[in-house]
Amino acid sequence: MALKTFNPTTPGQRQLVMVDRSALYKGKPLKKLTEGKHSNGGRGNTGRITVRFRGGGHKQTYRLIDFKRTKVDVPATVERLEYDPNRTAFIALIKYADGELSYILAPQRLAVGDTVVAGSYVDVKPGNAMPMGNMPVGTIVHNVEMKIGKGGQMARSAGTYAQIVGRDHDYVILRLNSGEQRMVHGRCMATIGAVSNHDHMNTSIGKAGRTRWLGRRPHNRGVVMNPIDHPHGGGEGRTSGGRHPVTPWGKPTKGKKTRSNKSTNKFILISRHKRKKK
């Protein structure tokens, strides 16, 4: 879908660049595939802020997306493409041959009326899902499972994808958008194609208020806070912090590695940080 600009009648309109969503369905989502969604304003179960700078925003309804694609060998027709406020990608309402309705992530080049199917051996075309061990090397995939039967976890944002670049016994080797290469079991499911709405990266929010509609509040720097609020806070007049940059909890920021070693490290063949060192 194309990008949309506006007449510069105000500064917010001048800078605004949106994705043209005129081809999407304009009605409400299917009610039986939705759930209520309670906004917590960045607070945890004790009522304390656990994620800073969140709160407000437009009320949203959660769409139940099928990330597992376990209904095998039953063809489904794409009924409509929809906007989903809970994610950057678009979603597709599909109707199976037995009448069941479901939402899936819409891949690029999927259109209303197309047929998709999940199974062990299916055609390599956008929207079809099968175990990655049965796909040819070089296939572009999204909604990739990391554990067998858990449902897709990787490559779900707008425009993202992973590419199968090799095989190693029961595993396939994936190259992710970040540059990381990792092994995933060949029986893990993935959907063929790249995720829709690839122009999302080229949008411009245009004004602060539009960010507030998304539920994001202003992000304050530590040096403008009081000493009680941040290690960089305090000082008479403007100061530069006076110490190496740290988080509000005193941990070094600006690139210090904080990830602990995990048992899954052995599946990462090339780290996503490698290309930053070149």
From Swiss-Prot:
In the record, biological process GO terms are: cytoplasmic translation
Q: Name one GO molecular function term.
A: structural constituent of ribosome
| Keyword Ribonucleoprotein set for record | yes
Question: Which SMART domains does the annotation name?
Answer: Ribosomal_L2, Ribosomal_L2_C
- Keyword terms, alphabetized: Ribonucleoprotein, Ribosomal protein, RNA-binding, rRNA-binding
Instruction: List the InterPro entries.
Output: NA-bd_OB-fold, Rib_uL2_dom2, Ribosomal_uL2, Ribosomal_uL2_bac/org-type, Ribosomal_uL2_C, Ribosomal_uL2_CS, Ribosomal_uL2_dom3, Ribosomal_uL2_RNA-bd_dom
Q: Where is this region: Disordered?
A: 222-278
SUPFAM superfamilies per UniProt: Nucleic acid-binding proteins (SSF50249), Translation proteins SH3-like domain (SSF50104)
Ribonucleoprotein found in the keyword field? yes
**GO annotations of cellular component type:** large ribosomal subunit
State the Pfam families in the record: Ribosomal_L2, Ribosomal_L2_C
**HAMAP family given for it?**
Ribosomal_uL2_B
How does this protein assemble? Answer: Part of the 50S ribosomal subunit. Forms a bridge to the 30S subunit in the 70S ribosome.
Q: Which family does it belong to?
A: Belongs to the universal ribosomal protein uL2 family.
The function of this protein is:
One of the primary rRNA binding proteins. Required for association of the 30S and 50S subunits to form the 70S ribosome, for tRNA binding and peptide bond formation. It has been suggested to have peptidyltransferase activity; this is somewhat controversial. Makes several contacts with the 16S rRNA in the 70S ribosome.
Query: What is this protein called in UniProt?
Result: Large ribosomal subunit protein uL2
